[in-house]
Amino acid sequence: MIEVVVNDRLGKKVRVKCLAEDSVGDFKKVLSLQIGTQPNKIVLQKGGSVLKDHISLEDYEVHDQTNLELYYL
């Protein structure tokens, strides 16, 4: 189990617990429940690269306490 920190760049930080093997799409579903937004309205970035829904967090080298940027569509 890892904890990922998601920052929406408007001052809101959300900590989400998940598994490293989870896909980005599954992670967005968990995140959307915490922030009250639909998963298809969320874009996640790490280091300026947009994360694709079908790839796992582990493949993007997202580890415990990794920071991701959150953008709304």
Curated annotation (Swiss-Prot):
GO terms for molecular function: protein tag activity. GO terms for biological process: cell morphogenesis involved in conjugation with cellular fusion; mRNA splicing, via spliceosome; positive regulation of RNA splicing; post-translational protein modification; protein modification process. One of its GO terms (cellular component) is nucleus. Keywords: Ubl conjugation pathway. It comes from the Eukaryota. SUPFAM superfamilies: Ubiquitin-like. Residues 1-73 form the Ubiquitin-like domain. The keyword Electron transport does not apply. Forms conjugate with SPH1 and HBT1. Involved in morphogenesis. This is Ubiquitin-like modifier HUB1. The gene is HUB1.
